[in-house]
Amino acid sequence: MVSVTRRSLLLGVGTSAAAAAALALGGCSLGQAPTRIRMACGEQGGTYVQFGELLRDALTRAGTTGLEVVTTGGSVANLELLKHRDAELAIVLADAAATDAQNKVAIGRVYQNYLQCFVRRGGPIGGLEDFPGRRISIGAPQSGAALTARRVLTALGLLDGADAVEVSELYLDEAMTALETNAVDAIFWSGGLPLPAVQSLETEVELVDLTSALPALEVDHPGMYTLAAVPASTYGSAESVRAIGVSNYLLARPDLPDDVAEALVDVLIGDAAQLVPEGSLGVQYLTASNLIDTSPIALHPAAQRRYRQLYG
């Protein structure tokens, strides 16, 4: 058996070495379904890891496929791990996935992300009109949040010229500390509701409505973003806050074994209630009619067949 460290997997290994690593982790031989697969998720404290852990537990209960949850910077990093065979599954924002629809397939659309912009309550930012010149963390390096945030800031005219903001890319724990210590004035996060890490902050925060960017986003990225809302109860606001929504896809490599793809579909549908984090307020897509909507990424053929077998 080949021994492969997590560090070598995340730094990237050659195709042949990565293939050997996958076999070693799975404890299988060529042509057989792996008994263990890796899923590239996101940062600790975020929704991606929560979902990955719930999916892992559901697969364990089903006795089909073991799942290793791999923490990463987010969607863009996850695509790289999938591309280089350092993960068999990845959860990825639809806008990040659509930048290159090749060499990947979808198992399903699983839930909606909300692009959230947190500022200190009573701080220097009360709305978008206060953004010019401010220090803003747009998300972790190689995260989907950073990709979406850059698109939003571009649409709002806040990345260039006299109104440009000062952009940094901070990991979640760094961003939270920076917000509390006034090192940044706002932080972006893309995830489900609520963001668990916010609930442990000593500093009171509030959300900024970013939805005035939607018309320009629709022109540049048609059909990718939707108008959503963060309920008032989420972070203690007196009213709901409008937000920008974007779907999440559970992606795989095209050579993911058919029986693994089928097992994943069975769990996504049969264990849907157990795949929603406790206290989650966001929109879930864990029904057959919603799971199959993964455009422009094609469904894994075996997953598509399984959806048809179950629901026609």
Regions flagged by a language model, labelled:
Residues 102-110, 136-137, 233-242:
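A structural signal for short loop-to-beta-strand junctions that line the ligand-binding cleft
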Residues 52, 68-105, 173-179, 193-201:
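Pocket-flanking alpha-helical
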Residues 34-62, 113-181, 293, 297-302:
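Bilobed "Venus flytrap"/periplasmic-binding protein-like clamshell domains
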Residues 94-97, 160-251, 255-256:
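Pocket-lining segment of extracytoplasmic ligand-binding domains
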Residues 34, 64, 77, 102, ...:
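Extracytoplasmic
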Residues 2, 8-27:
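N-terminal export signals
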Residues 29-31:
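Bacterial signal peptide processing site
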Residues 241-312:
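Segments of small-molecule ligand-sensing domains
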